[in-house]
């Protein structure tokens, strides 16, 4: 029996030794896992016709070209480019339309890792939608018929009514004086063309110096209003602006007050650290300073009102749009350095003080935008509001005399056509006939003074911003049938 059992055992061992070995089961490594997506899944309100989607995985990945061809998007859009680098899969999508909803699909296995015996990725579906964009419809110019100040003087109302009447028919000629209290540019244009510009511009640039001490050869005295009186008496219109000089520090202010030294004053951002935000806060020296300056300007404007002279008033110019376009300080002038909101607050403060506190009813308020490329996108953000602005203007310095349709339409669109529009400053004069032919209903143009190093007015060309204002072109413009000169103006008294 014992021998039999041993035999059976031996036979079993023999049979077992003849069987094939069993291969061990090896599990595949997990495929790459999606960690994040930019934009995030479900994002709404995207803009543009193209989109770059970046999918980030938990490991370095690859996406072979045959797998890239399987990535798809619906809704009529198309896949433009697929790129796998390190942990990121970048997909560029084209042909997106406003208001559309889309699903971008990366099929299972399209994204692969670099580990041996590894699964591909799971299917990824990325959904997003585009902002519905209403078709652009340009606004038509249909200005309101009244000034924002309900107590506006009779003369101011007369001027505004005249501008309304001429809108789309003719444009007024205008020049900026190179001095605060002289009609030097007007006289130079007249001497050459035989016609006076209808609009004369003056500037409170030298407010701190006024009045200069007796005996100075350089005289600044805003109490002398003989130039605007002469202009108004001859049926011309009067425009004032304000390059608002401010002190860099309280010490600079004190130095100006005590020693008549204004070396520490400026209006350019890169030359003063004066902070508009501090100026809007009561209790700061900056606030005390601007309130004193406003009071002083109000006194000079009152002299004009006492003579029944209406003033086209254009302060805080060129703030709109240039806060991110000029220099390391972020603005051209200090009133635009810290963005739109403080600037709008300052405009409203200035309006309240001059109209409601000092009772100036002779002002027609002009808000000026900047023409720097790309600035149009910012216009509305900076606009103080219809209740504080009568007319909107743009300062244009261009190496041509073509109609400025882009700038014109941007201004009209900003107020939905509710405000008159003007070329509030220019170098080369936009050709009035070309402007009218293009449908640009500019109320006036204001040529900036082109002067030599001694301050003498030049009608001859200088740099590219003025070089087309030749003697011949001045005569052409001042004789243009679409231009109103001072000789053509009615009495608006």
Where are these regions (language model features)?
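Substrate-binding cleft of secreted/luminal carbohydrate-active enzymes
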Residues: 171-177, 419-493
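Acidic, Ser/Thr/Gly/Pro-rich low-complexity segments and short DxT(G/T)-type signature motifs
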Residues: 24-43, 108-135
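Aromatic-lined carbohydrate-recognition surfaces of secreted/lumenal glycan-active proteins
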Residues: 175-176, 314-316, 347-377, 419-428
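Substrate-binding cleft of extracellular glycoside hydrolase catalytic domains
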Residues: 210, 214-351, 356, 360
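Aromatic- and acid-rich polysaccharide-binding/catalytic face
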Residues: 202, 379-401, 448
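C-terminal motif of bacterial Sec signal peptides marking the signal peptidase cleavage site
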Residues: 14-17
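Short, surface-exposed alpha-helix to beta-strand junction/turn motifs within ectodomains of secreted
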Residues: 49-82, 109-112
């Amino acid at each position: 029996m014992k021998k039999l059992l041993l035999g059976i055992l031996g036979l079993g061992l023999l049979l077992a030794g003849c069987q094939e070995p069993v291969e061990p089961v090896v599990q595949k490594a997990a495929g790459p896992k999606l960690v994040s997506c930019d934009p995030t899944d479900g994002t709404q309100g995207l803009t543009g016709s193209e989109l770059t989607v970046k999918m980030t995985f938990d490991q370095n990945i690859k996406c072979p070209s045959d797998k890239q061809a399987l990535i798809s998007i619906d809704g009529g859009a198309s896949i433009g480019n697929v790129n796998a680098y390190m942990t990121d899969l970048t997909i560029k999508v084209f042909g997106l339309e406003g208001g559309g909803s889309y699903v971008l699909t990366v099929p299972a296995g399209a994204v692969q890792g670099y580990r041996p015996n590894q699964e591909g990725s799971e299917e990824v579906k990325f959904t997003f939608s585009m902002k519905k964009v209403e078709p652009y419809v340009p606004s038509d110019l249909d200005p309101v018929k009244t000034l924002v100040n309900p107590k506006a003087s009779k003369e101011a109302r007369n001027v505004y009514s005249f501008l309304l009447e001429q809108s789309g028919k003719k444009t007024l000629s205008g020049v900026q004086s190179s001095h605060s209290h002289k009609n030097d540019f007007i006289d130079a244009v007249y001497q050459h063309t035989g016609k006076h510009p209808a609009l004369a511009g003056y500037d409170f640039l030298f407010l701190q110096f006024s009045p200069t001490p007796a005996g100075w050869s350089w005289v600044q005295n805003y109490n002398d209003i003989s130039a605007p009186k002469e202009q108004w008496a001859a049926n011309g219109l009067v425009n004032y602006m304000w390059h608002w000089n401010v002190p860099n520090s309280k010490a600079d202010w004190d130095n100006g007050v005590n020693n008549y030294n204004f070396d520490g004053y400026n209006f350019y951002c890169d030359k003063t650290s004066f902070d508009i935000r501090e100026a809007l806060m009561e209790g700061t020296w900056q606030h005390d300073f601007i309130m004193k300056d406003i009071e002083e300007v109000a006194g000079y404007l009152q002299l004009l009102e006492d003579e029944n002279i209406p003033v086209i008033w254009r302060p805080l110019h060129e703030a709109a749009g240039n806060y991110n376009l000029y220099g390391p300080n972020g603005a051209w002038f200090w009133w635009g350095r810290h963005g739109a909101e403080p600037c709008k607050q300052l405009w409203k403060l200035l309006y309240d003080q001059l109209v409601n506190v000092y009772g100036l009813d002779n002002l027609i308020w002009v808000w000026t935008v900047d023409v720097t490329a790309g600035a149009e996108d910012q216009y509305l953000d900076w606009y103080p509001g219809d209740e504080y602005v009568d007319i909107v203007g743009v300062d244009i310095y261009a190496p041509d005399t073509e109609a400025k349709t882009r700038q014109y339409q941007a201004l009209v669109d900003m107020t939905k056509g509710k405000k008159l529009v003007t070329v509030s400053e220019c170098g080369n004069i936009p050709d009035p006939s070309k402007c009218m032919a293009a449908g640009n209903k500019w109320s006036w143009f204001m040529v900036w003074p082109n002067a030599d190093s001694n301050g003498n007015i030049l009608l001859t060309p200088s740099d590219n911003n003025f070089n087309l204002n030749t003697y011949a072109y001045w005569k052409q413009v001042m004789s243009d049938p679409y231009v109103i000169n001072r000789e053509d103006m009615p009495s608006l008294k």
